[in-house]
């Protein structure tokens, strides 16, 4: 069963910042591919959110081609997944959400 996915404002800002970074420092194509990779990962999470708990109550799904982790939690009773943050793995892990 697919879960409803809600993306937090913080995660939206993370996505926007990452997109702009790739667009400015690589190319529009790389930035667009980043968004495609993110969407594929969201689909995987939506279909099966039972990833290992990585940090507090958050689970994490790495993107395939980009050094980012999608931190999320889910409510099994309500069938809702909350995307909390999209964290760049090259940053300090002490700053995890």
Where in the sequence are the language-model features?
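Enriched for short, Lys/Arg-rich terminal
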Residues: 73-97
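Basic/aromatic recognition patch in beta-strand/loop cores that engages polyanionic ligands
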Residues: 50-78
């Amino acid at each position: 069963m697919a879960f409803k996915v809600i993306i937090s404002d913080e995660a939206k800002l993370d996505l926007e910042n990452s997109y702009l970074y790739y667009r400015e420092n690589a190319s529009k194509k790389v930035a667009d591919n980043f968004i495609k990779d993110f969407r594929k990962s969201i689909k995987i999470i939506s279909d099966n959110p039972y990833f290992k708990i990585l940090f507090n109550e958050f689970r994490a799904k790495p993107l395939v081609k980009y050094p980012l982790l999608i931190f999320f939690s889910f409510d099994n009773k309500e069938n809702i997944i909350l995307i909390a943050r999209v964290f760049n793995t090259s940053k300090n892990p002490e700053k995890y959400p």
